[in-house]
């Protein structure tokens, strides 16, 4: 299992770095109420109202620390980057133009992760969204007007905002 996780991490890192995204690396952190790098390099911790743990390293890189001790590092802070209170997933807000990247990530992450996609429905109807999706496994309209979709592949050309909920893999 450790070998599989390591292989997935390697493939993910290579794929993501090859398409010039903000994503830099996944690093191992000890999570015990603060952000402490296991290699004792400079890092700090902040907690937000969304129960998110934001990891800062050398004041240059930022990311999220999970309860499992995984820190996702970005060279720029994404528009929205939150972690659940129990640390089992992150929610990332992306522009739909980044869909190519999302497809690459999902093709790798779907091996061991659960992915939920959230679309803001301000100027779109559901009938415009559902036919553009492949392998749709669940679609629910929330009280706040968002369409929640659980899918295995995405083919979208709609100019909307995207919430991506990824269940994290603990790299032990």
From Swiss-Prot:
The keyword Metal-binding does not apply. Keywords: Glycoprotein, Secreted, Signal. Its main location: secreted. InterPro entries: CfaA/B/C. One of its GO terms (cellular component) is extracellular region. The keyword Glycoprotein applies. Pfam families: CfaA_B_C (PF11912). Glycans are attached at residues 37, 153. Residues 1-21 form the signal peptide. It is found in: Secreted. This is Counting factor-associated protein B. It comes from Dictyostelium discoideum. The gene is cfaB.
């Amino acid at each position: 299992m450790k070998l599989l996780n390591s292989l997935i991490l390697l493939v993910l890192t290579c794929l993501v770095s090859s398409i010039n995204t903000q994503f830099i690396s996944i690093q191992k952190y000890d999570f015990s109420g603060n952000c402490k790098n296991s290699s004792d390099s400079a890092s700090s911790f902040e907690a937000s109202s969304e129960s998110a743990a934001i990891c800062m390293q050398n004041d240059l890189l930022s990311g999220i620390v999970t309860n499992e001790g995984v820190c996702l590092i970005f060279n720029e802070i994404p528009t929205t980057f939150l972690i659940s209170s129990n640390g089992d997933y992150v929610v990332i807000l992306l522009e739909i133009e980044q869909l190519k990247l999302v497809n690459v990530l999902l093709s790798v992450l779907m091996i061991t992760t659960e992915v939920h996609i959230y679309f803001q429905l301000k100027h779109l109807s559901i009938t415009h969204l559902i036919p553009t999706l492949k392998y749709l496994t669940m679609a629910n309209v929330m009280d706040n007007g968002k369409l929640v979709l659980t899918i295995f592949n995405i083919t979208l050309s709609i100019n909307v905002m995207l919430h991506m909920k990824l269940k994290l893999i603990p790299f032990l």
